[in-house]
Amino acid sequence: MANIKSAKKRAVQSEKRRKHNASRRSMMRTFIKKVYAAIATGDKEVAQKAFNDMQPIVDRQAGKGLIHKNKAARHKSNLVARINAMQ
């Protein structure tokens, strides 16, 4: 454990941020999994709705630095390609 007061404070802040980020990351991953699950069912409308729900969440987390913007773009590109490939 840190001895200096500012280091103790930083440790507390880091732990608080870690928990907050873990929660946000988990939520984002859940939205992404819902899109994959909708694609697996084969219903294009449901998959499109799930994608539309997921997209602003991923963009928001990328904007806040939780994930890199290129990773967000890669997720969206991959999922929209899978949705467009459906009949």
Swiss-Prot record:
Residues covered by region (Disordered): 1-27
Origin: domain of life: Bacteria
One GO BP annotation of this record: translation
GO molecular function per UniProt: small ribosomal subunit rRNA binding; structural constituent of ribosome
Membrane-spanning segments: none
Protein task: Binds directly to 16S ribosomal RNA.
Family statement drawn from the similarity comment of this UniProt entry: Belongs to the bacterial ribosomal protein bS20 family.
PANTHER family: 30S RIBOSOMAL PROTEIN S20, SMALL RIBOSOMAL SUBUNIT PROTEIN BS20C
HAMAP family: Ribosomal_bS20
Name of protein: Small ribosomal subunit protein bS20
Organism: Pectobacterium carotovorum subsp. carotovorum (strain PC1)
